[in-house]
Design a protein with these regions (language model features):
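Paired acidic/hydrophobic, glycine-rich loop segments that form the ligand-binding mouth/hinge
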Residues: 50-54
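Long, aromatic- and glycine/proline-rich binding clefts that accommodate carbohydrate-like moieties
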Residues: 76-77, 125-177, 184, 208-212
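Ligand-binding "clamshell"
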Residues: 62-82, 144-150
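Short, charged, surface-exposed loops that flank catalytic or proteolytic processing sites
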Residues: 184-197
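A bilobed periplasmic-binding-protein/Venus flytrap-type ligand-binding module shared by bacterial periplasmic
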Residues: 90-103
Length: 212
């Protein structure tokens, strides 16, 4: 989506979906259509898959002492087509304060603690959550225990946010439409052209007179 416009019905999007469909049963097991993050990680970490797309926490688990992949995993940006650009999905973990809280000062003080350098380093070590503070990607002490951040830094710099901000309250509906149409291509029920036409209609209906 560009500036809130629905632009999914185009040949390049259709071609990308058809390409992914062509991987099914070849370089991608058909069972992947039923996987969530942890199922994907288990297959990959057991050495039964060559590639995996997942969140940063997986790196730490793959390098654990009991992991058969310790020292054998690399991280790269998602591939792009000839005229595209490499980009990953930007997500995050957010803290928020209820506007009706009776103790806003205490709530703000707590969030400052939970989001400071020390807390983010602890979350990185214990949970594998990548920091949101850019300075930590240059911190030698942090890199000593999490060298993967040198790779993540450049990848995150090229990240593209999900359309949640643009689509506002309609994002769950948008996300569900994208999921269902993509799934229908990957399981062979329709081709990329039909899917992008269908998705264009669904997203246009969701938008209505404007995202709100």
């Amino acid at each position: 989506m560009k500036k809130g416009n629905v632009t999914i019905n185009n040949p390049k999007a259709a071609q990308a979906l058809d390409m992914a469909r062509g991987w099914m049963g070849k370089i991608t097991p058909k069972g992947v259509l039923g996987y969530k993050e942890e199922e994907s990680r288990t297959v990959f970490q057991n050495g039964d898959a060559l590639f995996m797309r997942n969140w940063p926490y997986v790196w730490q688990l793959s390098q654990a002492d009991d992991s058969p992949l310790k020292g054998k995993v690399g991280v790269i940006q998602l591939p792009a087509g000839p005229e595209g650009r490499q980009a990953t999905t930007l997500g995050g973990w957010q803290w928020s304060i209820n506007a009706n809280t009776k103790n806003p000062e205490a709530a703000i003080a707590l969030l400052k603690i939970l989001s400071d350098d020390d807390s983010q380093i602890t979350r990185l070590k214990m949970l594998g959550h990548a920091p949101t503070r850019v300075a930590l990607y240059e911190n030698k002490d942090v890199l000593a225990v999490a060298p993967e951040l040198t790779q993540f830094r450049d990848i995150f710099a090229q990240a593209v946010p999900r359309p949640a901000t643009v689509t506002k309250a309609q994002y769950p509906r948008v996300s569900n439409a994208i999921f269902n149409v993509t799934f229908s291509v990957l399981n062979g029920k329709e081709d990329g052209k039909k899917a992008t036409e269908d998705l264009q209609k669904r997203l246009t209906r969701a938008k209505g007179a404007g995202w709100r």
